[in-house]
């Protein structure tokens, strides 16, 4: 039966899902944080309308779709599929996904584009397809496969948002609004994470939290010639580096303050040892390394723990610096960097954000003007021990 399901889902992908995802890739459905005119241009709504239109053409029995749009909030798509009548299920399955995207950024291969789908070596490239436009389409394709093969399934519901890449700030309101429609949920499926390989099903047992914000350092009112100022005026980027050194050991990448860390249990360590043994060097081969760059650690288990249960800092943006092409001999008046810190799943993000601001702004070097503006603080998540029935199913 599993082979029949696989063949049916593969057929649905080849004949329907892939084309729907190609259309989705062509939509510049940027999340609100990256498109201030999202409501005016209507692209997020168009992404939901396309998804709804596709779903209603699939012939799924008992399907109902509804776009929910509250004033000033990004829209959501509510989906419901009745349980099959030949077997009674007490609780429902909940599907989660999102249809908003992050900006395309730079670095695309010459033969690929953010907004034009390309299939190469059996893989589909384009912005937003894997994060995570496919979630909606594959969830319903799975339900359709069960119905086509006569396999009973429980009632299925879903609430697909368009604000995930902007911290899902509207989603909780929609969940409360749809609480009666959603009913009693027995299983939540979110197709929005990573996998170790394409040979087996991977289940995410935890996700790190996140905090982020901007650090601004100002030393001058206007830029001045570096020949006149250097050696007297402290350089703003130098101060930024010193502030970041309060958080991260730049030699190792280790986060220094204990407030951002947690104790890793023996069970978590054991799980990661098992994954490391299964994947080996594929853990490192998954990344597009340049030249002879080496990983922070060559120990596969430690690398997995770094990625899942330890805090890590990333600088994601910078203002106050001209491009190299346009850079002259000027000492710039300020530097602003945007940072993101992944947090262990059980660390309180709000407390960590407050601590970060205190660490950054305390006793500014050279009494420079230092500001930290938090932009996000999201808690992580760690799954409870799986119920026996779902462990058996997997």
Residue ranges and their predicted role:
Residues 341-344, 371-387:
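A short beta-alpha structural unit
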Residues 201-205, 324-329:
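Short beta-strand/turn micro-motifs at beta-sheet edges
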Residues 130, 221-223, 341-349, 378:
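A generic structural motif
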Residues 89-160:
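Active-site metal-coordination/substrate-binding segment of hydrolases
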Residues 244-245, 252, 385-394:
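Active-site-adjacent substrate-binding region
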Residues 153-235:
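Histidine/acidic-residue-rich, glycine-tolerant segments that coordinate divalent metal ions
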Residues 181, 196, 205, 226-318, ...:
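Acidic-enriched catalytic cores of C-N bond-cleaving enzymes acting on peptides and small amides
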Residues 2-107, 334, 338, 351:
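N-terminal helical capping/dimerization or prosegment-like subdomains
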């Amino acid at each position: 039966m599993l082979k029949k399901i696989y063949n049916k889902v593969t057929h649905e992908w080849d004949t329907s899902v892939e084309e729907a995802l190609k259309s989705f890739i062509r939509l510049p459905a940027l999340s609100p944080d990256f498109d201030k005119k999202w409501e005016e241009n209507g692209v997020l709504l168009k992404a939901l309308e396309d998804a709804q239109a596709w779903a209603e053409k699939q012939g799924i029995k008992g399907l109902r779709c509804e776009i929910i749009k509250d004033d000033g909030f990004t829209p959501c798509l509510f989906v419901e599929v009745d349980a099959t009548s030949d077997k009674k299920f007490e609780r429902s399955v909940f599907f989660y996904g999102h249809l908003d995207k992050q900006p395309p950024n730079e670095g695309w291969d010459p033969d690929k584009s953010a907004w034009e789908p390309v299939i190469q070596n059996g893989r589909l490239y384009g912005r937003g397809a894997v994060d995570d436009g496919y979630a909606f389409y594959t969830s319903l394709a799975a339900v359709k496969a069960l119905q086509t093969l006569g396999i009973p399934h429980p009632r299925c519901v879903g609430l697909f948002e368009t604000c995930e890449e902007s911290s899902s700030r509207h989603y909780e309101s929609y969940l409360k609004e749809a609480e009666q429609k959603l009913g009693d949920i027995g299983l939540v499926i979110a197709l929005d994470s990573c996998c170790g390989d394409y040979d087996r099903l991977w289940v995410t047992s935890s996700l790190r939290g996140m905090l982020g914000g901007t650090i601004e350092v100002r030393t001058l009112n206007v830029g001045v010639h570096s020949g006149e100022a250097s050696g007297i005026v402290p350089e703003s980027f130098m101060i930024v580096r010193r502030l970041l050194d309060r958080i991260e050991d730049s030699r190792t990448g280790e986060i220094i303050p204990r407030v951002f860390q947690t104790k890793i249990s023996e069970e978590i360590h054991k799980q990661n040892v098992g994954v490391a043994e299964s994947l080996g060097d594929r853990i490192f081969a998954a990344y597009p390394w340049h030249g002879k760059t080496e990983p922070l650690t060559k120990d596969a288990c430690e690398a997995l723990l770094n990625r899942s249960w330890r805090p890590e800092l990333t600088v994601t943006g910078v203002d106050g610096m001209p491009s190299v092409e346009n850079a002259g001999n000027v000492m710039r008046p300020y530097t602003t960097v945007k940072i993101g810190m992944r947090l262990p799943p059980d660390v309180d993000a709000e407390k960590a954000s407050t601590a970060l601001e205190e660490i950054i702004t305390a006793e500014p070097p050279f009494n420079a003007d230092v500001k930290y503006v938090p932009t996000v603080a999201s808690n992580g998540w760690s799954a409870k021990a799986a119920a026996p029935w779902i462990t058996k199913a997997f």
